[in-house]
């Protein structure tokens, strides 16, 4: 549930916040967050229990689509298969080309910092998405505070095989400044680490979840645009239904079709991104 609350209510929850520029607040007391590493590890472990096989450090280097089946080429050998699913994240465009489809995907390098509060370790008691400063802030169990910046902002194109995995100094300085402005007691807090990862973005900032328009037994789950982790359980369920039954049963995913960018029927709503 989302509640619309006043600025005075916000001060009850976050007494250390500077309310300059804030006119209204959306409050979600039952919301939470997930540890991405632990979640992916749990999914992999359950997949192994159910008979799945996973390989690491064995990248796809090509796909032969000329026959009745596809041959996925890897350094460890070829894999012949009737069904190919492209869920390759920032490598999805290259994989798509091997699947004979040019996907409208852009890669952007996204950055975060982690700070150690100088003195007030209890100032952040909620996850904060600050639309005024375009920042997001979250306390970690070890007392550190995660800080990043939201959209709209300039995308930073990157090569998924070769990109800087730490935040830029300019980003660190500006994000630290924004944190100190919104939570004055955190001004000057030590930045203990930073990192950068990649978003794979579609033109409407919603993913493509569809059967390939080129090959019948090829499927696409690409372009999560920064929010695929939180919808991944439903995404996997719908994709499995599409493969087994010919269409998704749990929810209508037709708006996420691969052709929408050619027809102009893009998805109007979005979780975020550089859209008005």
Predicted regions mapped to residue ranges:
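General small-molecule cofactor/ligand-binding pocket signal
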Residues: 3-5, 53-55, 192
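C-terminal catalytic lobe of FAD-dependent flavoproteins
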Residues: 36, 177-276
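Central helical "cap/lid" subdomain
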Residues: 78-126, 250
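Helical element adjacent to the flavin cofactor pocket in flavoenzyme catalytic cores
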Residues: 26-83
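Active-site lid/adjacent beta-loop-alpha segment flanking the redox-cofactor pocket in flavoenzymes
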Residues: 102-104, 117-218
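A short, glycine/Asx- and small/polar-enriched loop/turn
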Residues: 14-22, 64-71, 201-205, 214-215
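A short alpha-helix-loop-beta-strand transition element characteristic
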Residues: 1-8, 102-105, 188, 246-253
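Helix-loop-beta segment of a Rossmann-like dinucleotide-binding subdomain
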Residues: 2-50, 158-162, 216, 222-224
């Amino acid at each position: 549930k989302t509640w619309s609350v006043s600025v005075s209510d916000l001060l009850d929850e976050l007494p250390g916040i500077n309310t300059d520029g804030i006119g209204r607040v959306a409050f979600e007391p039952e919301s939470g967050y997930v540890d991405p590493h632990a979640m992916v590890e749990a999914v992999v472990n359950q997949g192994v229990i159910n008979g799945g096989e996973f390989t690491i450090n064995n990248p796809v280097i090509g796909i032969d689509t000329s026959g009745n089946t596809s041959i996925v080429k890897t350094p460890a050998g070829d894999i012949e298969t009737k069904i190919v699913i492209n869920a390759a994240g920032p490598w999805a465009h290259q994989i798509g080309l091997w699947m004979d489809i040019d996907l409208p995907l852009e890669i952007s390098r996204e950055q975060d910092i982690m700070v150690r509060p100088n003195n007030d370790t209890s100032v952040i008691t909620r996850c904060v998405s600050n639309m005024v400063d375009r920042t997001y802030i979250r306390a970690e169990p070890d007392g550190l505070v995660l800080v990043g910046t939201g959209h709209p902002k300039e995308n930073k194109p990157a090569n998924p095989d070769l990109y800087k995995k730490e935040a830029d100094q300019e980003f660190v300085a500006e994000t630290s400044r924004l944190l100190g402005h919104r939570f004055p007691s955190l001004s000057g807090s030590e930045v203990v680490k930073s990192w950068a990862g990649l978003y794979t973005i579609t033109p409407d900032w919603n993913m493509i979840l569809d059967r390939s328009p080129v090959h019948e037994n090829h499927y696409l789950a690409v372009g999560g645009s920064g929010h695929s982790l939180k919808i991944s359980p439903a995404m996997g369920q719908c994709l499995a239904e599409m493969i087994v039954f010919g269409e998704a049963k749990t929810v209508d995913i037709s708006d996420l079709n691969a052709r929408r960018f050619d027809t102009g029927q893009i998805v109007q709503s979005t979780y975020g991104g550089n859209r008005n």
